[in-house]
A protein has these predicted regions:
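N-terminal transmembrane-helix/juxtamembrane module of multi-pass inner/ER membrane proteins
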Residues: 87, 91-94, 344, 348-352
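Alpha-helical transmembrane segments of multi-pass integral membrane proteins
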Residues: 240-348
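Generic structural signal for well-ordered, non-membrane alpha-helical segments
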Residues: 82-86, 90, 105, 185, ...
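Amphipathic, well-packed alpha-helical segments that form the structural scaffold of globular domains
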Residues: 94, 98, 113, 129, ...
C-alpha cells in the first residue's frame, strides 16, 4: 500500500513544494517530520516525459513529483514547530470526527469541515455531484462565510471592532488548516476587506475586493490562474455580485420566509450564471435540479457546519461528550444525504455534455438570457 504527502524540499536551488510518493509509513508521520530518502525526480508539468503540459500541480504551487526509491529515514524532531500548527489541528479534528461520528456521517462532516473527501461514500459523493451539491464538499468561500457567520452569531453585532479582530485571524487560520486553496483565500481577503472598510469609514466595494484578491493570489503564484477551483470560485462570486442584487430587489416587503427563500434562490442563480459553462466544460454535466437542491439543503448545510464544528471542538476537549454532541449534526447530515438521494432518482435531473446538441442547447440558453 502506498501513500503520498506534500513536502518541502530542503535543498538550495530547488522549488520548495513537491508531492512525495512513498509507502504507507508516511501516513503515521506528524506534520513537520523530516524525510531523508533517495527519490526519482519528475517534473510536475510532464511526469511521464512525453511532452505533456499539465497545470493541475503547478496551479497549486507544486513543480516537482518525487517517487521513493529504497528505504527512507524519518526524523520527528521538528514536528512540533509552530508553523505546522494548522496541519496538526487538521489531523486532530479528523481524528475527533472519526471517534465521535459513525462512518457515513463522519465522512460527510470531514469533507464539509476539512475538504477531505477520500472517506466519503462513493454513492453519496455521486448523488451530491449529480444534484449540484458537490461544492459543499470542496472547502471554499462558502465555508469561510459559514465560519464568519458562526463567529458573528456567537459574538453578536455590538462590538464590531472586537468581532473584526477575532473573525479575521480565525478565518485565515481555518484557511491554513484546510489547505489554503485559491477559493478560500479569495473569501478570506474579501471578508476581511468587507469587515475593515466600515471601521475606516469606507463603503465595501465587492468588485474591488474580488479584483484585489485575484491580484494577491496571482502575485504569489501566476500558475494559479489554471486552477479549476479558482476559476469556479471567482466566476461564481462575480455572478453573485452582478446578478443577485438585481434579483433580490423583488424580495423587499415580502414575508420573512419568502424573503429568505428568494435570497437563497437569487444567490444560487447568481453563482451559476458564470460558473455553469466552466463546470460543463470541466466536468461534462449540468444538474437541472441544482436550484432546488441548494434551496432545500444549503441552509441545512450551514447548520450542520456550525453545529458539527462546535461538536468536534467540544469532543476534542472532552472526548466523553463526543457521541452526545454529534447527535444533532448527524441528523442534519442524514437529511442532506437523503434529499440528495431522492433528487438523484428524478428523471432528467442532469444533462450530460457529451454531444454537440447539448452544447448547442447551452449556448442557446445563454444567447436568450
Amino acid at each position: 500500500r502506498g501513500a503520498k504527502v506534500p513536502v518541502k524540499i530542503l535543498h538550495r536551488g530547488l522549488p520548495g513544494k513537491a508531492i512525495y510518493y512513498g509507502d504507507s509509513s508516511l501516513l503515521d508521520l506528524a506534520p513537520g517530520a523530516h524525510v531523508t530518502a533517495e527519490a526519482l525526480f519528475n517534473s510536475a508539468t510532464d511526469p511521464t516525459g512525453k511532452g505533456l503540459h499539465l497545470r493541475n500541480f503547478t496551479a497549486k504551487g507544486v513543480y516537482i513529483l518525487l517517487y521513493q526509491r529504497g528505504d527512507p529515514t524519518y526524523d520527528d524532531t521538528n514536528a512540533g514547530a509552530l508553523k505546522y500548527l494548522p496541519q496538526r489541528i487538521a489531523r486532530t479534528l479528523g481524528e475527533t470526527i472519526e471517534r465521535s461520528y459513525s462512518e457515513r456521517e463522519g465522512a460527510f462532516l470531514r469533507a464539509l469541515l476539512l475538504g477531505d473527501k477520500k472517506y466519503l461514500d462513493e454513492e453519496d459523493a455521486s448523488n451530491l455531484s449529480e444534484v449540484g451539491l458537490s461544492h459543499v464538499m470542496a472547502v471554499s468561500g462558502l465555508h469561510c462565510c459559514f465560519l464568519a457567520s458562526l463567529i458573528g452569531s456567537l459574538m453578536g453585532d455590538r462590538r464590531k471592532k472586537l468581532r473584526c479582530a477575532v473573525t479575521i485571524p480565525l478565518i485565515f487560520l481555518y484557511a491554513f488548516v484546510t489547505g489554503l486553496t485559491p477559493s478560500i483565500l479569495r473569501a478570506c481577503i474579501m471578508i476581511s476587506m468587507g469587515m475593515i472598510a466600515p471601521l475606516l469609514g469606507r463603503d465595501n466595494d465587492p468588485p474591488t475586493s474580488i479584483s484585489f484578491a485575484l491580484l494577491l493570489i496571482l502575485l504569489k503564484n501566476p500558475f494559479a490562474i489554471a486552477s479549476i477551483s479558482l476559476q469556479l470560485s471567482f466566476s461564481a462570486v462575480s455572478g453573485i455580485i452582478w446578478l443577485t442584487p438585481k434579483l433580490t430587489k423583488r424580495a423587499h416587503g415580502k414575508h420573512k420566509l419568502v424573503r429568505a427563500a428568494l435570497l437563497s434562490f437569487s444567490t444560487t442563480l447568481g453563482a451559476m450564471v458564470f460558473s455553469t459553462p466552466l463546470a460543463c466544460y470541466y466536468f461534462g454535466t449540468l444538474s437541472i435540479v441544482s436550484l432546488l437542491s441548494n434551496l432545500l439543503c444549503l441552509w441545512l448545510v450551514s447548520v450542520v457546519f456550525a453545529l458539527g464544528l462546535l461538536s468536534v471542538l467540544i469532543a476534542a476537549a472532552v472526548p466523553q461528550l463526543g457521541a452526545a454532541c454529534a447527535f444533532v449534526p448527524a441528523l442534519g447530515i442524514r437529511a442532506v444525504l437523503a434529499i440528495a438521494g431522492l433528487l438523484e432518482e428524478l428523471p432528467f435531473h442532469a444533462i450530460y455534455f457529451n454531444t454537440a446538441f447539448s452544447v448547442a442547447w447551452l449556448a442557446y440558453v445563454y444567447a436568450i438570457f
